[in-house]
Curated annotation (Swiss-Prot):
It catalyses: Random endo-hydrolysis of N-acetyl-beta-D-glucosaminide (1->4)-beta-linkages in chitin and chitodextrins. It comes from Oryza sativa subsp. japonica (Rice). Gene3D superfamilies: 1.10.530.10, Endochitinase, domain 2 (3.30.20.10), Endochitinase-like (3.30.60.10). The keyword Calcium does not apply. The active site is at 147 (proton donor). GO terms for molecular function: beta-N-acetylglucosaminidase activity; chitin binding; chitinase activity; endochitinase activity. This is Chitinase 12. It is an enzyme of class 3 (hydrolase).
Amino acid sequence: MRALAVVAMVATAFLAAAVHAEQCGSQAGGAVCPNCLCCSQFGWCGSTSDYCGAGCQSQCSAAGCGGGGPTPPSGSGGSGVASIVSRSLFDQMLLHRNDAACPASNFYTYDAFVAAASAFPGFAAAGGDADTNKREVAAFLAQTSHETTGGWATAPDGPYAWGYCFKEENGGAAGPDYCQQSAQWPCAAGKKYYGRGPIQLSYNFNYGPAGQAIGADLLGDPDLVASDATVSFDTAFWFWMTPQSPKPSCHAVATGQWTPSADDQAAGRVPGYGVITNIINGGLECGHGEDDRVADRIGFYKRYCDILGVSYDANLDCYSQRPFGS
């Protein structure tokens, strides 16, 4: 999460809007009503048709509540990730991504998300296990939301409604070039490989193989990751799906395909969302007790799981995990 330096600016812009009385749904950061009450289209909890009828956001029937979570809005009727996340649900999850105060306003589109996901057919496609697929979507959007967040503790609709606010590392153009000498992935003259896109792809040794995988010259034109939304999502899905030894892929962990080795177990690395955080930024965030950045990643994950109507898995943090390779 490299965008926090701008949080004060965003907070000031919306201070007048920070007082909200709504109780649930998109108006309350994806919150779910207590006691199985319905969440109306306007963000209020109740049990009459005004709350449970047209526009109801979650727990719209007793059956939906009985499953231990909200009833997610119906999908788009498409296939793959589109069958899990409809356009309206995407807008609810990334509620403020197109806010005028966000530098990435109107960049990250639903169509680009679906198009990029379709290029990685294994994503959210665990055969016959709908809940696992939903959790993988929640985990992907949570980790990338943390990397691009514009939220703060008292932000309108809560801190976890501000994912995808940024598309470039704050100050990246004026910073270091993130180039490590490599014969395989040589840096182009005058180019910088700072964080861009949903996963904040960094360094030439990531831009090179990501570009090779998706068919784009990202070493020669790294700015594509911040100018073409589909390419931007492509790089995030590439990172998510690709193992980089000794790390497993985020996808393998999210879908239960990763079995920790004896060394992993000795390092406290056990299956769960926390290992995904370790894969992405464990060297800075994991293994030294509680960390606000890890907690932020968990907050996004819980919100998205709630919206998708699935329970959280175990081992959400990496506070006691040693980073990979340490």
